[in-house]
């Protein structure tokens, strides 16, 4: 005969991922001639629940290196860009995410592409991919068997004579 028990544990109760391609613009003090480089550093983010979705707030610093004055001088634009992304998270269970822990992972680091010069404005695209795991309480049912195998009991027939014999055979000066 068996019965079932429930174990309450933490597990991944929802997952999702999303690819983002966003357009941004920055202004330069002078009209750039050529874009020499674009890189992203200091990517920071955190996730939280909003309704049935997960929202990721984040920011990164973008550095755009450009030349100007007919490619005779260079300069770098440094700017912090903030973002707010909404990600739909799928769950096989009918659960409430409000008391859950949100784990955000970067599946593709933000990268800069398609950089164009429009007067003294530099337009560019940022691509990134984020993955979300929602960790919360869930229950696992396990089968527990009531029938246990009987343990075989061994009776040690140790007499006082046997114990005294063991004590006499022990050499206390074995290290010498």
Question: In which residue ranges do the predicted regions lie?
Answer:
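Viral structural modules
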Residues: 1-176
């Amino acid at each position: 005969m068996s019965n079932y028990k429930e174990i309450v544990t933490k597990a991944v109760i929802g997952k999702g991922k999303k690819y983002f391609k966003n357009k941004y613009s920055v202004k330069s003090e002078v009209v750039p001639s050529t874009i020499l480089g674009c890189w992203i550093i200091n990517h920071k983010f955190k996730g939280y629940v909003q309704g049935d979705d997960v929202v990721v707030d984040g920011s990164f610093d973008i550095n755009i290196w450009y030349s100007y004055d007919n490619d005779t001088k260079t300069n770098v634009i440094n700017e912090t860009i903030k973002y707010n992304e909404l990600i739909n998270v799928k769950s096989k269970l009918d659960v409430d995410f409000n008391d859950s822990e949100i784990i955000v992972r970067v599946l593709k680091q933000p990268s800069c592409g398609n950089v164009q010069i429009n007067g003294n404005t530099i337009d560019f695209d940022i691509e990134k991919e984020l993955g979300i795991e929602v960790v919360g309480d869930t229950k696992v049912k396990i089968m527990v068997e009531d029938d246990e195998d009987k343990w075989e009991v061994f009776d040690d027939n140790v007499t006082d004579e046997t114990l005294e014999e063991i004590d006499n055979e022990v050499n206390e000066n074995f290290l010498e």
